[in-house]
Amino acid sequence: MSDIKTAVITGSTSGIGLGMAKGLAAAGMNIMMNGLETAAEIEPLRKSLEDSYGIQAHYSAANMMEPDGARGLIEAALSTFGRVDVLVNNAGIQFVSPVEDFPDDKWQAIINLNLSAAFYTTKAALPGMKQRGWGRIINIASAHGLVASPFKSAYVAAKHGIVGLTKTVALEVAEQGITVNAICPGYVWTPLVERQIPDTAKARGLTEEQVKRDVLLAAQPTKKFATVEELAALGQFLCTDGAASITGAALPVDGGWTAH
Ligand code: NAD
C-alpha cells in the first residue's frame, strides 16, 4: 500500500469543505470529495485539485443526510484509495426561524446532516485508523457549538452535539494515535452565510446590510469574516505530528466572538 494519506471531506464542493480539500491536497493527501452540486460544477474543482497539487482526487455524491450515504462515502473512499487517514465532517445546512414556528422536517434534516452524519462516518472510518495506529478526525462545528444565537435552535443544538461527540470519541481513541477535534468557526463568508441573510433579515425586521453589520459581525470583535484559507491552515496543522497532543478540543476561529 502506498504511503500517501487519504482525506475524506464531507461537503467539499463549496465553501469551507472545498478550502479544507485544497489545504489537505496541498499537504500531499489524496482527496475524496463529496457534495450535492452538479457533476458539471464539481468536475473542474476535482480536476483542479489534481492539477494544482499532483494528488488523486475522486468524488462521491453520497447524501450525508442518510446513514447509508454517510457509511457509503467511507466505503467508497476505502474501495478507491484503500485507506481513510483523515476524516473531515463538514457538510452542514442552516435554517433560521423562531422555535415555535421551526418546521419539524427542518429540525430533523439539520440534526441528520450536521450531527448524525459525523457519527456514521466516524464509526466507519475508525477501524482502519486503529489498524494503522494513526488518524485525524476534524469536525467542523461552529462558534454555535459553544454559544447560542436566537432563531437557530436546530443548528445550535446540532453544533453543541458535535462538540460533545468530538470529546467522547477523542477519549475513546486517545491511546491509538488518533486525534479528534472540533473547529468552531465564527462567521466565514461562504454560500451558507450568504443564503441565511435574507431569512435573518425577515426574522429580525432588518435590511440585509444591517444583518451583516449589526447581527453577524456585531458578534465578531475583529469585524471581519474568517476565511476558508484560515480554516484550512488549522486543518493542515491538526494533521501534522506536531498536533498529536491536541485532542478532544473545540478550537474557536471566530475573531474573538466566544471570548465575550
Ligand atoms: P456551503 O453551503 O458553502 O457548503 C456546504 C457543503 O455541504 C456543499 O459542498 C454542499 O454540497 C454540501 N452538502 C449539503 N448538503 C449535503 C448532503 N445532504 N450531503 C452531502 N453534502 C451536502 O457551507 P459552508 O459555509 O462552507 O459550511 C460548511 C460547514 O461549516 C457547515 O457544517 C457549517 O455549519 C460550518 N460553519 C460555517 C460557518 C460560516 O460562517 N460559513 C461558520 C461556522 C460553521
Regions found by a protein language model. Give the residues of each.
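Active-site helix of classical SDR
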Residues: 122, 158, 166
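Short, small/polar-rich loop/turn modules that mediate ligand/substrate recognition or access, typified
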Residues: 174, 179, 246-248
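Conserved glycine-rich cofactor-binding loop
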Residues: 13-15
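Residue(s) in the substrate-gating loop at a strand-loop-helix junction
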Residues: 142
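Conserved glycine-rich Rossmann-like NAD(P)H-binding loop of the short-chain dehydrogenase/reductase
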Residues: 27-44
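Short C-terminal tail/terminal secondary-structure segment
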Residues: 146-147, 235-236, 247-260
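Substrate-binding pocket helix/loop in short-chain dehydrogenase/reductase
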Residues: 98-99, 106-111, 137, 216
